[in-house]
From Swiss-Prot:
Binding positions for L-aspartate per the UniProt entry: 117, 121-122
Protein name: Argininosuccinate synthase
Pathway in which the depicted protein is active: Amino-acid biosynthesis; L-arginine biosynthesis; L-arginine from L-ornithine and carbamoyl phosphate: step 2/3
UniProt source species: Streptococcus suis (strain 05ZYH33)
Description of how the protein assembles with itself and partners: Homotetramer.
Pfam families named in the record: Arginosuc_syn_C (PF20979), Arginosuc_synth (PF00764)
GO molecular function: argininosuccinate synthase activity; ATP binding
Catalytic activity from the UniProt record: L-citrulline + L-aspartate + ATP = 2-(N(omega)-L-arginino)succinate + AMP + diphosphate + H(+)
Binding site for L-citrulline: 85, 121, 125, 173, 258, 270
EC code(s) of this entry: 6.3.4.5
Main location: cytoplasm
Length: 397
């Protein structure tokens, strides 16, 4: 009997490798691994899927698409979930879902499988995105169905010829892409424990970072970072370059107890050296170029967009509407920010823009001042009139 085809979001780790062995009894498994900048040995992952029993194995390089279509809107929004987390994992899930659906259409598969547990955010992100893109596709979640302890999973792996990774003893669960690295589990589950140094993989400890600061010039055109220190780079390569430079200086370490979509609190350790550097630089160019009303309203939109992305609603009309508003603000965001990297800090120390709204002649307190200070008297009188009237009325009562 012909089996149905199934697309598996494959990472090469134990969970999704065991999933191939488990699913191949009922499905023709097509493994799909996306390169979003995690730095894995992709050829090994491709071959591993086939050796376990997948009928096809695909590795897709989607770094530039990830950077342009998913990271860039978040950068331009200054998107932080709960004002701390730059949405590292949350941003990659809609792209991965989109590619899984495309592969299902290409191969005639009827089902998609992922390796998420039943208590995380990613199961929601994948399944809601898949439903938005093609409601006819079925979704299975083997790890959620098994409810196995790690020991039981290892036994199944060994009995079914699934290679057990050498780094399985690592206490941490790690997810990495261009925009950063997420670490959880192990001693991190106790929020009173300071994260040990072996938690971190792409940043130097600020205490051990260079004793001399490094300055980086980041150029933006229409809100898009296009060059580092005068060198033009694709967006994906630019982010990777800053991950290395800023990571060396210990920039971008975040310790966050966050409210998960599924209703629990989770302690996460993030490393986002490139992201924090770019977010900091981009904000300073906006401060120079956006009118006050846009500057004051934009954070409200950004906060709502951050929540939508975190909660798995990338493919939602509300997300589209907010992204459209934010994109409209970026035409004037041109210029260069000089960022000082030093022992965990990324600080903009200078900025310039051809669209700058900063007028030194108006701002100066020297004799070159062109600001009409005599106009202040009338302005204050009119601006304060409602406050004055309110005070007078309440004083009478």
């Amino acid at each position: 009997m012909t089996k149905e085809k199934l697309i598996l979001a494959y990472s090469g780790g134990l969970d999704t490798s065991v999933a191939i062995a488990w699913l191949k009894k009922d499905y023709d498994v097509i493994a799909v691994c996306m390169d979003v900048g995690e730095g894995k040995n992709l050829e090994f992952i491709h071959d591993k899927a086939l050796s376990i029993g997948a009928i096809e194995s695909h590795v897709l390089d989607v770094k530039e698409e990830f950077a342009q279509e998913y990271v860039l809107p978040a950068l331009q929004a200054h998107a932080y979930y709960e004002q701390k987390y730059p949405l590292v994992s949350a941003l990659s899930r809609p792209l991965i879902s989109k590619k899984l659906v495309e592969m299902a259409h290409k191969t005639g598969a009827t089902t998609i499988a992922h390796g998420c547990t039943g208590k995380g955010n990613d199961q929601v992100r994948f399944e809601v995105a898949i439903a938005a893109l093609d409601p006819s596709l079925k979704v299975v979640a083997p790890v959620r169905e098994w409810k196995w302890a790690r020991e039981e999973e290892i036994i199944f792996a060994k009995e079914n010829g699934v290679p057990v990774p050498a780094d399985l003893d690592s206490p941490y669960s790690v997810d990495q892409n261009l925009w950063g690295r997420a670490n959880e589990c192990g001693v991190l589950e106790n929020p009173w424990n300071e994260a040990p140094e072996d938690t971190f993989g792409i940043t130097t400890s600020p205490e051990n970072a260079p004793d001399t600061p490094e300055y980086v010039d980041i150029e933006f055109k229409a809100g898009i970072p296009v060059a580092v220190n005068g060198e033009k780079l694709s967006l994906a390569n630019l982010i990777q370059r800053l991950n290395v430079i800023a990571g060396k200086h210990g920039v971008g370490r975040i310790d966050h107890v966050e409210n998960r979509l599924v209703g629990i609190k989770s302690r996460e350790i993030y490393e986002c050296p490139g992201a924090i550097t770019l977010l900091t630089a981009h904000k300073e160019i906006e401060d120079l170029t956006l009118v006050r009303e846009v500057s004051h309203f934009k954070p409200i939109v950004s906060n709502e967009l951050s929540n939508l992305i975190y909660n798995g609603l990338w493919f939602n009309p509300a997300t589209d509407a907010l992204k459209a508003y934010l994109a409209q603000t970026q035409a004037v965001v041109n210029g260069t920010a000089k960022v000082k990297l030093y022992k965990g800090s990324a600080k903009v120390v200078a900025r310039k823009s051809p669209n700058s709204l900063y007028d030194e002649d108006l701002a100066t307190y020297t004799s070159a001042d062109t600001f009409d200070q005599d106009a202040a008297v009338g302005f204050i009188k009119l601006w304060g009139l409602p406050t004055k009237v309110n005070a007078e009325i309440h004083k009478k009562s």
